[in-house]
């Protein structure tokens, strides 16, 4: 009902739209780094987002890691870094998008102990400590 009002108000054509259902759950942005030998999967729980992630925490999450390994990496055979955005509702994973790039949470990944560009390329990643990020935005007026 609301979508039809939106379409009419903005004079849009339904065939030009991609509409997703709202899924209530926990949002994650997942860093994935892969080559022929290793897969590094680092879930980042997103608490606050406004275009970019503002508040997030690196978490170990076997449900997400297993889903990426058994579903996504079976069909997506890239050999580099990419980002998966998803919603986790209980044990069910809903993929929102897959991006062939680093996410805005990449600095958090490096700070948590994994740098894909270091000399220890694709060493086994061990999460040493849970680390949180809160992005502070400042405005200057002149």
What are these regions (language model features)?
Residues 89, 119-142:
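Peripheral (often C-terminal) accessory segments that flank ATP-dependent C-N-forming ligase machineries
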Residues 71-72, 108, 120:
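Residues within well-ordered alpha helices
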Residues 75-108:
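Conserved metal-phosphate-binding beta-hairpin within the catalytic cores
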Residues 47-58, 99-112:
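Glycine-rich phosphate/pyrophosphate-binding beta-alpha loops
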Residues 2-76, 87-88, 92-94:
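Phosphate-binding site of ATP-dependent enzymes
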Residues 76-77, 113, 125-126:
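Glycine-centered helix-boundary capping/hinge motifs
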């Amino acid at each position: 009902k609301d979508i039809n009002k939106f379409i009419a108000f903005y004079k849009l054509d339904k065939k030009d739209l991609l509409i997703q259902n709202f899924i209530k759950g926990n949002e994650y942005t997942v860093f994935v780094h892969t080559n022929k030998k290793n897969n590094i999967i680092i879930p980042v729980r997103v608490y606050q987002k406004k275009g970019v992630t503002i508040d997030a925490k690196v978490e170990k999450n076997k449900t997400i890691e297993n889903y990426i390994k058994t579903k996504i990496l079976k069909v997506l055979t890239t050999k580099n870094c990419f980002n998966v955005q998803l919603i986790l509702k209980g044990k069910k994973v809903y993929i929102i998008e897959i991006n062939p790039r680093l996410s805005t949470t990449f600095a958090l990944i490096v700070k948590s102990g994994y740098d894909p560009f270091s000399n220890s390329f694709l060493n086994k990643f061990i999460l040493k400590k849970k680390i949180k990020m809160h992005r502070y935005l400042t405005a200057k007026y002149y």
